[in-house]
Amino acid sequence: MNKKMFRYFCAILIFLFIINIGMISASEIDQSTDAFSNQILSDDSGVNEVLTDDPEGCSTETNPEDTEVQGETTDPTPNPNDSTDPNVEEHQEEVLEKTTLSSVDYVIKNKYLNVYLKDSSKNAIANQKVTLTINGKTLSAITNSNGIAKFNITNAAKTYPVTLNFEGDDKYASSSKTLNLRVIAKPIYTKMTIAQYGIFVGNYLNVYLKTTAGKAIANQTIKITINGKTYTRITKKNGLAKLKINLKSNIYSVSIKYAGKGNYIPVSKSIKVNVLSSKLIGKTNYGKVYFIGIIGNRSSNIKIAYVVGLHSMEHKIHDSLYKQMINKVNMKYKYYIYRIVLTNKKGSYSTLRMRGQMLAKNYIVPHAKNQNYDLVVDIHSTSGISYKQTYFIHVPKNQHEPSMKLAKKTIQLIKSIEGNSKILYWSPPTQTSPPYIHLPLIKAGTPTFVFETWSYEKKSQTDKRAKILIQAIDKVFD
């Protein structure tokens, strides 16, 4: 090869070598560009961000630490999402007053159902729209000043699912209520009767369910709530529902409810019952003495005792006062009863009297002396044969001023209660019982007097006089 050809050949090789190097460099540049593109991402705000391995990278933004607000320097463009920005008002959720809707679950056909709208403090909410949906139809009414929305129910007699609704407003929260509404075409009204309000431990609370016409309603469910527990009882043929009471002696609030069924209208009663204790303090082959209490105000500092049964033949006034007293709940003072019961009633009039007197002497007097009574009242009646007066109070032998004072004040109180009362203070010429009970108590410092009424008066008169005496005694220390 001559020199000229050799130079030409070398020039071609150099040219090819240069082209090859250029292609390799272009490839590397393309690869760097791709790698850089793959690191471009989007943040939540939709603005692309360049990521780099170098923390100081190639970002054109100033380091955040360098842009921190110093002193009084402020950012001229506040961030609308910054909750601390003073130019942005903080949103506070408004709290609405809670509301409730209520009504009974029955209505008489073509009569009004009252729906009550109240706030959380049980205050009536007036001038608000309430709706009632029954059998696919929605009725509306505006509450009156008592918070009552009245709905005239004309549906056929049966039970319907009903929805009550209040939509609420800018002050009151919405509320709704669903119930099964019993529409009654021919209502039968009912009533409850409580047999007694004084119940001895272990005895029964007796509740009678009857129509207002007096017909017993059998096989009905009665709910009785006492001392925080609710008991269900079914009425018997005579309408009686019974609940055995095994609570300690005290006064209890009782709620009794009958929800109604068929055409029977619901009825409820809230009462107080006094659970009593009865203690046997003396016993012989002819009689017993019971100590019964507490009756009335258990917190009172005034303690009073009645004595009944001293003379068994005078039982009418004994029975009347005893039954009335044990059923008393709301009284000012604290009361007890000593009850003498003869188990052997065979013998003469004087024999029976002496038995009662001996039971009083041997059991009542020793017990009563230790009780610090403010007053003891012995209950009697007279035939009017030996005594010319038949309605009176007296202190045996007129020997105790505190007893005399209380006796005379009781007479004044009876006269203030009973118009044209014939009661008076009178001391009988003959008295058989004082040595056995009254005089020993007076000697011990316990004020004592005797109440007498006529043995042959009508029962209604005896009951009336017992009632008035109880009322008067409950004011005697005022």
Model-derived regions: residue spans:
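Enriched for extracellular/lumenal, surface-exposed ectodomains of secreted and cell-surface proteins
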Residues: 134, 159-179, 226, 251-271
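Beta-strand-rich structural segments
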Residues: 105-121, 164, 196-213, 256
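Structured catalytic-domain cores with a bias toward divalent-metal coordination
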Residues: 276-478
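Short flexible loop/turn segments that cap and initiate beta-strands
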Residues: 119-138, 210-230
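Glycine-centered loop-to-beta-strand initiation motif
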Residues: 143-151, 235-243
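Low-complexity, acidic Ser/Thr/Pro-rich repeat tracts that form intrinsically disordered stalk/linker regions
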Residues: 23-100, 104
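Sec-dependent N-terminal signal peptides of Gram-positive bacterial secreted proteins and lipoproteins
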Residues: 4-27
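Surface-exposed, short loops/turns at beta-strand junctions within beta-sandwich domains
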Residues: 152-159, 244-251
